[in-house]
């Protein structure tokens, strides 16, 4: 009798169960481990972010804070659209709230990347667009570099990646210093998101190119 092969959704569910039971860095987490992700094998958009904040740790819902409100506004998505896991996957670089350091949250713990990230990415075959939100995600995927030029030169990384600043309260100050973000980047971001959600349906609806161009940067392993 042949062994039954696990389907990709079953494999993802089994792996997520292991992730949510992980205690590899429990000793370093002031509020204890609570991995917070939103993943489905059908998702076409992946948000690679930093790490949950303290409010998100309490709710267990990714981006259930002011940063999430700002990110959804940038993306042009309603809360219902954003939390539709069949379309939008959310996987931070660190899955748990890392605590505080200096004037803000501590950097995401590195254990999640080493233990889980590649395994999870392999089970997200439908992803067309990955949003790299903040410096930690950008450096992991793209290598060393500054956030602002990567955001401004977003076309260099399409159609696979789209770099964004972290949507914390500090991003308002950053936006005031960089007015091209709302003028040039956000319209292109929203167009890229609709293309990732609907594929050729959006293109055939009569929409223009919105400055996205057709030649994307070769994919970088990760996601």
Regions found by a protein language model. Give the residues of each.
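A polyanion-binding, active-site-adjacent surface
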Residues: 2-196
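Short, intrinsically disordered C-terminal tails of secreted or membrane-associated proteins
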Residues: 218-221
């Amino acid at each position: 009798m042949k062994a039954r092969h696990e389907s990709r959704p079953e494999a993802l569910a089994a792996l997520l169960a292991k992730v949510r039971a992980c205690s590899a860095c429990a000793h370093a987490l002031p509020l204890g481990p609570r991995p917070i992700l939103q993943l489905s094998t059908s998702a076409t958009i992946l948000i690679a972010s930093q790490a949950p904040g303290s409010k998100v740790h309490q709710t267990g819902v990714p981006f259930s804070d002011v940063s999430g409100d700002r990110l959804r506004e940038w993306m042009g998505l309603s809360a219902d659209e954003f939390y539709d896991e069949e379309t939008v996957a959310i996987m931070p670089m660190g899955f748990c709230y890392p605590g505080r350091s200096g004037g803000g949250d501590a950097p995401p713990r590195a254990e999640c990347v080493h233990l889980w990230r590649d395994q999870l990415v392999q089970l997200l075959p439908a992803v067309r667009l990955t949003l790299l939100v903040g410096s930690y995600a950008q450096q992991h995927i793209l290598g060393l570099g500054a956030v602002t030029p990567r955001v401004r030169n977003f076309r260099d990384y399409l159609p696979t990646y789209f770099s964004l600043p972290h949507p914390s309260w500090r991003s308002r100050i950053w936006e005031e210093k960089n007015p091209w973000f709302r003028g040039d980047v956000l319209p292109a971001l929203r167009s890229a998101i609709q293309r990732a959600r609907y594929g050729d349906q959006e293109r055939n609806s009569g929409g223009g190119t919105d400055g996205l161009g057709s030649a994307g940067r070769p994919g970088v392993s990760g996601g």
